[in-house]
Amino acid sequence: MSKRPIPIDDLLKEDAIVPKYIPKSKRAKSSNGPGEDGANTTLKLQYPQSSVNHGSAVSRSTQFSAHQKSSTRPTTSLQPPSKLRHKKFQFDWDDIDDPHYNPQPLYSFELDQLGVENGDNYNDNKNNNDDDDNFDFQDPLLHDDRNSGHWSTKLLSEMTDRDWRIFNEDYGITTKGKKIPHATRSWDESGLDPKILASLKSFGFRQPTPVQRASIPISLELRDVVGVAETGSGKTLAFLLPLLHYLSRVDGNYLNYEKVRNEPLALVLAPTRELALQITQEAEKFGKQLGFNVLSIIGGRQYQETMDQIDNMIVGRGVHIVVGTPGRLLDSVERKILNFSKCYYLVMDEADRMIDMGFEKDLNKLINLLPKNEKLSTTIDGKLFHLTKRLTMMYTATISPPIEKITKSYLIDPAYIYIGGAGEALDNIDQHFDYLSTYAESARLSKLIKVVQGHKRRNRNALVIIFANFKHVCDVLSLELEQNNLLNVVIHGSKSQEAREEALEDFRTHQAPILVATDVAARGIDVPNVSLVINYQMSKKFDEYIHRIGRTGRAGNLGESYTFLDDADAETFMPLKKFLKSGRKKVPEWLYRYNIG
């Protein structure tokens, strides 16, 4: 069996031995006296003997080390005392003075673990076998199974704080507030009612989106939520699923025998009729399986039609969830069609959009019509609905001063959720810009047709949305597209509600694969597989530009946008430049050169 190599620690100990300086008086006594090779006598360095016997190999190493140390010091001949006096000094070192001395090493091992005990040779250790090469140092960091592996391979109980940080980074989740629960990793871990989980499975929802992962656990704790996320991130289910879970926990006797038909238990507010209808469709899909009725209150419909709908809801004693726009809802309350005295669950979707559209006063009026928060836990309603306060969920793309005002006025200790790069350049949208130095309507129309035709050739089943700022421009574009055999539909404020719904349905089903619209359709309409958005006219507010192009590139798909600009759009150039830079997108050369005065 071959001899073991010498431990590096022991070699370093030998190399670290400090030479002992011999005073002149002792050197004189040890010399042979004057005249006997006195001129050639050199200074002798004495090294203390090591107590560790390393064998012949170690001796050779020690001799070499000592020789190396002595060779680095010049061999000085004896000289007159006058020339040596200024060099006469003596070091007096303590262990604490050694810069390499560490009384509390990062890792401390017992000597017998390493096979060395009381300075014994490695070859003389207790076991003296080759298996000693595989030592288990018992490092707690190396052997902590909780710190090994990705979070997706662990049980929920094994998740560490580090795992949760990585999880949130993976899904772009940021939160703000006190004692916010962890996001859910899957539907099964969400805590939702089993019937809701079964519905999710039957509808093919395999995994929650980031906003759903973050929002649902907070809502299930009956805590107010402010979610900052873009349209298309899955916000609808983020608030509908906790809402349905809440309804499933309401006292059964109240639901079956005491509930009044026109007293909804939950209210969802939306800025536009289109978004309200979209939310209604999603809520009805789940509500039918769970036994809850959904009613939409939007403009363009007769009040009698709404009343008939409520009366015809045979199952479940009337309406449970109301979805609508603020103005129409206020009218319905004033006409006694609806009563919100039992409505303890409020959702405001795209709240910033409602503020922009002038609904701030209507919002305040509606919220004040809801039951108050004070001392709910001591009331009968608190026991029936298992609540201590009213529950409010608000979703917005930006946190503006009016939004902050509403939050401070009506929400209690809310948890803030920020998803991904809300407000930042969208990574999966390829943005193109065409700057027209001279305004020529004919040239712009010609380029528009070429862009649409080129995109259609590359993507035969493509859905395209074209935005303009004015209704008459939309009508002109629609005629121009028809003349070039490009089927399209138009949506703007002058269209009736029935015409708008029919146009959207034709667009969704690809019967008319091009939609021409004003900003009324820019927010809230969730049409899958839109591959191109064209801004025939740049929006007057830059935020609207973000909402427009957000119609494409959804659910992880790639999308394109094409925007025409001219000098009249100069107010949007600076925010556009910052927007592109923040998202590490290419800034057009003309935008770099443009003199933004």
UniProtKB/Swiss-Prot annotation:
Ranges for domain Helicase ATP-binding: 216-417
Enzyme class (EC, first level): hydrolase
Gene3D superfamilies: P-loop containing nucleotide triphosphate hydrolases (3.40.50.300)
Keyword terms: ATP-binding, Cytoplasm, Helicase, Hydrolase, mRNA processing, mRNA splicing, Nucleotide-binding, Nucleus
Annotated Polar residues bias: 39-80
Record has Membrane as a keyword: no
Keyword Cytoplasm attributed: yes
Domain Helicase C-terminal: from-to ranges: 444-595
CDD domains: SF2_C_DEAD (cd18787)
E.C. number: 3.6.4.13
PROSITE patterns referenced in this protein's UniProt entry, alphabetically: DEAD_ATP_HELICASE, HELICASE_ATP_BIND_1, HELICASE_CTER, Q_MOTIF
Catalytic activity: ATP + H2O = ADP + phosphate + H(+)
GO MF term (any one): ATP hydrolysis activity
Primary location group: cytoplasm
Binding site for ATP: 229-236
Domain of life of the organism encoding this protein: Eukaryota
UniProt domain comment: The Q motif is unique to and characteristic of the DEAD box family of RNA helicases and controls ATP binding and hydrolysis.
The protein's assembly and partners: Component of the U5 snRNP complex.
PANTHER family linked to this entry: ATP-DEPENDENT RNA HELICASE DBP3 (PTHR47958)
Family the UniProt entry places it in: Belongs to the DEAD box helicase family. DDX23/PRP28 subfamily.
This protein's name: Pre-mRNA-splicing ATP-dependent RNA helicase PRP28
Organism listed in the record: Lodderomyces elongisporus (strain ATCC 11503 / CBS 2605 / JCM 1781 / NBRC 1676 / NRRL YB-4239)
